[in-house]
């Protein structure tokens, strides 16, 4: 039976692995995090839950809509979007997809090597994995580039123009409402979006508790990527008070940095394959439109490997 190693258990990697397994292949996933999902992330603190990566599940792709429509609807404020949310948070979707997969968490793959036997992986503690016949990498593009930089592959040249940007997010609980809608995207140089977490399905709080996730703009985040959490917290709170024109007295406040939050310049195609090395790379940075594009890229790559269309035969024939 053909065996695959797949680095990255975000929704792109999970969807790809799910379809490969259904096609009769064996897939071992590796992820450096404590849980699956990547930016489909939900953080819990006491009785509060915060979707501090992707704020919701939305998009127009038919297959993606079929997938997310199993979850309750959420009116984010933009009635043009089909927006859904699991009651336990966006991370629940990733958990649902991972439930039947073999995922090794807390495992940071530091190096990869191709031999006559296949792919060999080494984690940060020196533990080896392999050999695997085929390797798929769904990590953020800069991390993918670092993993494959020692290989003789044309993929490196094809990835050179992809650009990803960071984002800081704040998880905030206050006694008074800050915005009148479920979500606000102010025209502001620092704050990109404010999401009312307490308005989401299954998250009704005490009437005197209002929880929010605030995300900073890409431009501000690039300029302040290496600032301390305390400095970022002070800057966001100051900007928030100017936007709402009210005093903000946090009951809870924490910030988190996503180093690779958004794609400024996407690849423009759903995946890349090096058939000689039996190596494929994909991720949300390929099409660059969040979770729905990540899901689509993972699905298209899996389909190409399982049942290539005529245009894909040349690329995938060495995988068969």
How would you describe each model-predicted region?
Residues 56-63, 76-98, 226-235:
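Short beta-strand to alpha-helix junction loop
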Residues 1-12:
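Beta1/beta-strand and adjacent pyrophosphate-binding region of the FAD-binding site
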Residues 37, 132-184, 246-248:
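Central helical "cap/lid" subdomain
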Residues 2, 125-134:
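Core beta-strand elements of the Rossmann-like FAD/NAD(P) dinucleotide-binding domain
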